[in-house]
Amino acid sequence: MASRYSPDRSADMGRESPVRWRHGTHRLPGVISRPVPVSDPVQRPVPVSDPNHRPAPVTHGPDDVALVFESGGMRGAYTAGLVRVMLEAGLSFPWVGGISAGCTNTCNFVSRDTWRTREAYLGLTTDPQAGGWGSFVTGKGYFNSEHIYLHTSAPDESIPFDWETFSASPTTVRLGAFRCDTGEEVYWGLEDMPTMADLLVRARASSSMPVLMPMVEVDGAPYVDGAVGPTGGFAIDAARVDGYDKLLVVMTRPEGYRKPPMRRHEIEILQRLYPRYPALVQAVIDRPENYNRTVEELEHLRSQGRVYLFRPERMPIANGELRYDRIVTAFEAGLAQARRELPAIEAFLAS
């Protein structure tokens, strides 16, 4: 079945379901179209963790702009370059939200961790438990989300997360996931996550791609990647509910990209896999239309000066990439583009 099915297409789809709001109560990138090997750890010239981490200081930032991170799987390594550049520049935002890989970038930005912005992606390339087709056939998912989200973020683990800084942030945070039994997009905020465990299970749910990864239960309800929701992978609906109409949207696809519709055999696979969740099936089928509509809306808002779109000039990797050298290339390319665009971003924020 896997040989007939293109993960990049199944996971790149979403339905116009209602947005459920839970007091600030997240991914569905398309994954790879071919197997890729995990890199040799010996070739990895980075430390396992950074014992000298200090949160990046805040020096300035707008009070009326929401920062929105698109989903995109490992393509988020490219946009992580922008996360680092903005942190190094001392920027902060009153509202930050994301879906799937956008959830990872959201959390690293709010925790102001310049080291983890890179390592959250590079660290997976040499972790034998992170995923791959071997993980998929054993039922753990192409990306082993249980390991990635629940067993790497503690202080003594491979990619420690600065929970103290994150949880103390005055920023409004929104992470979105798709609830499979009701067809709702649910957004969670800091008020829903009093512990790091509460955050991690929600980040995991936000990033659990249909077909390629198991559903994740949160408070007894089944969730998958939030990118199958009504916007196709952009938390702009959550930003609007919170009163923000000026947006910096960080995208993982280049200018001109549009999602193609699903093929008939892909739809049949979804229907066989999820007979108990018709809302999920329809959401995945509808995602190309929803995604394309959102992109067109954002481009229109950009023409009015209400939105800044950071788009990769060229995306060098697929969303399921696990090769160290490819991830480094993507991150460095994103870093270089972000440094070139920072003056334009700063001008937009000040306008």
Label every PLM stretch briefly.
Residues 2-99, 107-351:
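Patatin-like phospholipase
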